[in-house]
Amino acid sequence: MSMTTSRERNVPPDDNEIELGRSRHSDVAPESESPQAHLLNSDVASVTKNFMRNASHATANSGAIAAVLSYCIASISMTVINKFTVSGEKFTMNLLVLLCQCSVGVAMVYAAKCMGWIQIRTLNMRDVKTWFPISTMLVFVIYTGSKALQHMDIPIYTIFKNLTIILIAYGELLWFNGRITPMVFLSFILMVLSSIIAAWPDLAPSTAKTLYSRAFESLNLYTGVPHATEGWGEGVRTEAASAMHPHTALSPLSVKPYVGAATPLAAAVAQQNSEAAASSSTLSSWSTNGYVWMLANCMISATYVLVMRKRIKLTGFKDWDTMFYNNLLSIPVLLFMSLLVENWSVETFEHNFPREKRSTLVFAILLSGTGGVFISYTTAWCIRVTSSTTYSMVGALNKLPLALSGMLFFGNPVTPYNSIGVAVGFIAGIVYAVGKYKQVVAARIANSDATGASTSLSSSSSAAPSGEYVFDLKGEIPTHTRQQ
């Protein structure tokens, strides 16, 4: 018996037993091997956990980058197509164009649903009541944007869109407990400065002429002598002077005051100033209307983004749901507003869609409807995987290629003002991005000091403040899959 036992102890373990980490008589193994095996298993588990966490963070980052790039491409293409569609002073059917775009978008998404490519959540009355205000605001966002784009060049339009970022940031400060750091505030100052620089050619001359004309109007009332205003209203003054001195070829500046002439001269000057002011108003009304529409668009866009972020949490909509129901619920609003505001007569259609450009315009509208699907989806995607402020920041950084596209496709003039304005706006976007990055890092360091967690940028998403990047698997392309 002792010989058998000795022989069994000398039999080496087979490969399967070695692979399983035990021998045939592992119960008599030395106790010193147990802590080593436990340590080895814990190291393997730690490495595996870190690998999976880094993989998920990499997936989230790649998904966020994909969302940002997709939104940039959609934004540039939609702006160029819409500018081509509504460009021109005589185009008056913006709401009809938006109605066609939304209808094309709904048809495309519904076709994708019927082919089984995506799934769309079934709509109920609760979701309709929750989401209908969002769709109504989207109508006003797109409409005011199209009107501003109709009256403004693309570089100026893109610069003023930066002001939306400021409104969104302060909205997040009030609604989502956001925070504005000094560097972020500096970027806001640069954004406002870029807008002032870009708009200076439209704002400065009218102000200077008004002050200049008022000063000389007061002087004319006392002296009775019309004074030149450097080419402004010269035709009116010359005719007035010729009427009072028909036998002289003297210029208005050489006319000497005489008794009793103050009243007719004052009347002539008043008429001259009123006609010149009307002419100046006609020349500047086109760009002035653009600034008014742009201001309205910035305010409504900021409200839309902030309210949309809240409602997405309430409804639990996915990206395709958001895009589909945004456009679907916008159709009745657009139809009602178009019938109420726009004239659907044959003459109006001939005026807005002339025969020589009709086929091109119809194709552009259909193409813009297709692009509307893309931009609606990428907007919701970008907001979901990043934040509403980050989404608007991406739009700010996108202004440089967008402005270049306007100069390239529409021949917008390259002036020192709009060039400097675009450059300052682009720098403001970079400063803002750096400021938000430092804010995220500081928040993570503070959170790690409080919890003892790692300060790595790939740490848990709980360290991110409200409204910032959230590193989870939401970065994947958010499409629905059909349930088996």
UniProtKB/Swiss-Prot annotation:
UniProt key word Magnesium: no
Topology within the bilayer: Multi-pass membrane protein
Biased composition (Basic and acidic residues): 1-12, 19-28
Gene Ontology CC terms, in alphabetical order: cytoplasmic vesicle membrane; endoplasmic reticulum membrane; Golgi membrane
Entry's transmembrane regions: 61-81, 91-111, 130-150, 156-176, 180-200, 288-308, 322-342, 361-381, 391-411, 414-434
Annotated localization: Golgi apparatus membrane; Cytoplasmic vesicle membrane; Endoplasmic reticulum membrane
Topological domain ranges for the Cytoplasmic compartment: 1-60, 112-129, 177-179, 309-321, 382-390, 435-484
Claim: Transport is one of the keywords in the record: yes
One of the Pfam families matching this protein, by short name: EamA
InterPro entries: EamA_dom, TPT_transporter
Functional summary from the UniProt entry: Involved in the import of GDP-mannose from the cytoplasm into the Golgi lumen.
Entry similarity comment: Belongs to the TPT transporter family. SLC35D subfamily.
Subunit note: Homooligomer.
Protein name: GDP-mannose transporter
Annotated organism of origin: Malassezia globosa (strain ATCC MYA-4612 / CBS 7966) (Dandruff-associated fungus)
Gene this protein is translated from: VRG4
